[in-house]
């Protein structure tokens, strides 16, 4: 994942004479496809000192809120906008996603204005109900399902680390 030091270096590099107003937002992907998670809490706290919004593509982290075994969601860590692709890590149809907004730095009315311009006037109720069903499943059975999942990951990890090298 991206470290706070890397963010500080980038902000310094792209700010003219340390005028942080040159930077309109920082966009991160966390977790990455490979599962690397950035220190969102520290990064958000640093950026918020300069009124810089943090947008996190948390496509592969929609499950974070549903088990203590997973990292904290970027929403809870203070990111201003977080996008989850629900279908990637939860039982939902492909193309389903959710955008979360933490009020404070971002102009919510501006987002609504653009959202209304670009959203479909014919939303897919099948996709929306898939999100609702998915969230219902993890709300009602998430503890059990994710405990089983974590147990299987632990077993797999042990097997991979104790297997003899193929060479």
Residue spans for each PLM region:
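Conserved small/polar residues in nucleotide/adenosyl-binding loops
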Residues: 161-166
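Conserved PLP-enzyme active-site core in the AAT-like
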Residues: 1-160
């Amino acid at each position: 994942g991206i470290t706070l030091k890397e963010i500080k270096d980038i902000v310094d590099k792209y700010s003219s004479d340390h005028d942080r107003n040159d930077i309109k937002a920082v966009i991160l992907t966390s977790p990455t496809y490979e599962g690397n998670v950035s220190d969102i809490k520290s990064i958000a706290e640093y950026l918020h000192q300069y009124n810089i919004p943090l947008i996190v593509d948390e496509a592969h982290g929609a499950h974070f809120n549903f088990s203590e075994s997973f990292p904290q969601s970027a929403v809870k860590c203070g990111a201003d906008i977080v996008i989850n692709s629900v279908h990637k890590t939860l039982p939902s149809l492909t193309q389903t996603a959710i955008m979360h907004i933490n009020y404070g730095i971002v102009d919510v009315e501006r987002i609504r204005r653009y959202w209304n311009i670009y959203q479909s006037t014919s939303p897919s109720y099948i996709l929306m109900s898939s999100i609702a069903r998915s969230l219902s499943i993890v709300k009602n059975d998430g503890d059990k399902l994710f405990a089983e999942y974590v147990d299987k990951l632990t077993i797999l990890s042990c097997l991979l680390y104790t297997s003899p090298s193929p060479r």
